[in-house]
Amino acid sequence: HYSSRRQRQMCIRDRKGGSSREKWMKNDKPVLPGRLNDLRHIIYKSADTQWRQAKNNMGLMLKEGLLKENIDGEALKWAFNKMNKRKEDRKILMVISDGAPVDDSTLSTNTSDYLETNLKKTVKWIESKSNIELLAIGIGHDVTRYYNRAVKITDVHDLGDAMINQL
């Protein structure tokens, strides 16, 4: 539900690459431009927030229309950089995925495996070069081709149990 026509137009524009794609088009559409979509990082629960305070936010992951483009590799790098600055001895980065990374603007202007390759390189680096534990849960999709420590669930209602079991 959008409260104004402008919000509706902005949402549609964002799903088509946003200002990144507009800039690319104004610059004569260079070949193989890399990521061609604006980024939006949504934090459902920060490390400092108690679970009971963030419980309602977790349900937003299931909101239809909120997430249309998934640039997983860059989102993972962003989360890693934030987490890497923290002081805790044990750090766990949990990915909840609906499958493969997808961004129509990027995939239509680069190689078809561009986003998957970026994700695989990012995961490999985090898993081999850092002390951050990387866990993944695929909802309806097997994500073990990307993550070493991953499980698949078929029903979103199993998410809570899967999260606890992964820890």
Q: Which residue stretches match the model-derived regions?
A:
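Short, charged loop segments at secondary-structure junctions
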Residues: 17-74
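Single conserved hydrophobic/aromatic residue that forms the stacking wall/gate
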Residues: 1-14
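Surface-exposed acidic, glycine-flexible loop patches that form ligand/cofactor-binding
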Residues: 81-89
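Structural motif
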Residues: 90-94
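Short loop/turn segments at strand-loop or loop-helix junctions that form parts
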Residues: 13, 95-100
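A short acidic (Asp/Glu
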Residues: 15-23, 104-107, 145-148
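VWA/integrin I-like adhesion module and closely mimicked acidic/polar interface patches used
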Residues: 63-70, 74-81, 99-146, 153-154
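C-terminal helix of von Willebrand factor
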Residues: 149-167
